[in-house]
C-alpha cells in the first residue's frame, strides 16, 4: 500500500513564520507551498522550495484567494476571468522558483475558501481546472473528495490524487464541513489516528452526520499550522507504516517526473 503524506507549508509572511516547516519536511512526502496570496512571499517560497528539495519532498502549489488578513478562509466574490488569472499567476510564481532550483511543481491544491467553493460548484471548478490544464496539462490535482473538481480534471485530462484531510470532518457528499460548525475541525489526536486507521483498513470514513462513506485517497493531509502538527505527523506516519503502508509522493504513484 502506497500513500502520500502531505502538508500545507510556507504559510508565513515576511519575518513571521507559521508552523515548523523544517520538522514537517522531514516527515512528509509532498509539500503544498503557499504562493503569496493567502500567505507566503517570494523569500518564503524560495526557502520552502529549498527545504523540500533537501528533504526529497515533492513541490506543490497551494493557491488561494488574495486574502492574507483572513488567511484565505473568507469567501470572496471574484469574477471568474479574474480568478483564473490569479490562479495562473500563483502557479507561475512557484513554478519559476522551483525551476530555478532544478525542480518542477508536481501538483497543486486549492486553499481554504477557494477550495471549498470549487469543490462544491462546477461553475467554479470547470474554468479553474481549464486554466490549470492550459498552464501545465501534467500538473496533478491534489484535492479532497469532490465530484466537481474530479469531474473537471477528467474533462481536461488532468491527473488527480484525492487527499484525505485527517483533521477535518466530512459531510455525506464527501465535502468538507464548514469550519464554523461544531466538530468540523478534529483536535483529538486519538480520533485523528483512528480515522486514518479506519480509512486504510476499511476504505471508509464516518461523516459528520454519523454515516459511513467509502473513500479511496492517494494522500493524507496534515495542516502544518495545527498546534502539535509535528508530533501528530510523526504518529500518523508511524501508524501508516505499522499497517504496512509506504510513504510515497503522488508523483511517484502516478509515474510523473520531479524535474523540468
UniProtKB/Swiss-Prot annotation:
One Pfam family from the record: LamB_YcsF
Keywords, comma-separated and alphabetical: ATP-binding, Hydrolase, Nucleotide-binding, Plasmid
InterPro entries (UniProt xref): Glyco_hydro/deAcase_b/a-brl (IPR011330), LamB/YcsF/PxpA-like (IPR005501)
Catalytic reaction annotation: 5-oxo-L-proline + ATP + 2 H2O = L-glutamate + ADP + phosphate + H(+)
Domain of life: Bacteria
Enzyme Commission code(s) on record: 3.5.2.9
Keyword Membrane part of the UniProt annotation: no
GO biological process, one term: carbohydrate metabolic process
Function statement: Catalyzes the cleavage of 5-oxoproline to form L-glutamate coupled to the hydrolysis of ATP to ADP and inorganic phosphate.
Subunit record text: Forms a complex composed of PxpA, PxpB and PxpC.
HAMAP family linked: PxpA
Family to which the UniProt record says this protein belongs: Belongs to the LamB/PxpA family.
Protein name as catalogued: 5-oxoprolinase subunit A 2
Organism for this UniProt entry: Ralstonia nicotianae (strain ATCC BAA-1114 / GMI1000) (Ralstonia solanacearum)
Organism ancestry: Bacteria, Pseudomonadati, Pseudomonadota, Betaproteobacteria, Burkholderiales
Amino acid at each position: 500500500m502506497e500513500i502520500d503524506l502531505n502538508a500545507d507549508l510556507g504559510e508565513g509572511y515576511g519575518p513571521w513564520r507559521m508552523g515548523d516547516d523544517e520538522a514537517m519536511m522531514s516527515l512528509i512526502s509532498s509539500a503544498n507551498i503557499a504562493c503569496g496570496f493567502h500567505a507566503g512571499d517570494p523569500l518564503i517560497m524560495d526557502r520552502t522550495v529549498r527545504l523540500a528539495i533537501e528533504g526529497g519532498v515533492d513541490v506543490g502549489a497551494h493557491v488561494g484567494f488574495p486574502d492574507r488578513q483572513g488567511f484565505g478562509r473568507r469567501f470572496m466574490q471574484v469574477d471568474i476571468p479574474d480568478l483564473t488569472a490569479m490562479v495562473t499567476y500563483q502557479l507561475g510564481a512557484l513554478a519559476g522558483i522551483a525551476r530555478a532550483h532544478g525542480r518542477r511543481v508536481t501538483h497543486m491544491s486549492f486553499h481554504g475558501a477557494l477550495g471549498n467553493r470549487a469543490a462544491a460548484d462546477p461553475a467554479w471548478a470547470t474554468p479553474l481546472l481549464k486554466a490549470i490544464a492550459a498552464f501545465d496539462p501534467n500538473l496533478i490535482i491534489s484535492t479532497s473528495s469532490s465530484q466537481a473538481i474530479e469531474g473537471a480534471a477528467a474533462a481536461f485530462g488532468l491527473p488527480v490524487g484525492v487527499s484525505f484531510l485527517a483533521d477535518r470532518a466530512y459531510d455525506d457528499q464527501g465535502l468538507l464541513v464548514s469550519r464554523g460548525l461544531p466538530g468540523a475541525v478534529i483536535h483529538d489526536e486519538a480520533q485523528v489516528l483512528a480515522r486514518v486507521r479506519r480509512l486504510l483498513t476499511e476504505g471508509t470514513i464516518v461523516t459528520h452526520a454519523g454515516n459511513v462513506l467509502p473513500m479511496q485517497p492517494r494522500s493524507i493531509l496534515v495542516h502544518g499550522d495545527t498546534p502539535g502538527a509535528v508530533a501528530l505527523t510523526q504518529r500518523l506516519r508511524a501508524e501508516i507504516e505499522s499497517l504496512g503502508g509506504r510513504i510515497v509522493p503522488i508523483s511517484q504513484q502516478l509515474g510523473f517526473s520531479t524535474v523540468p
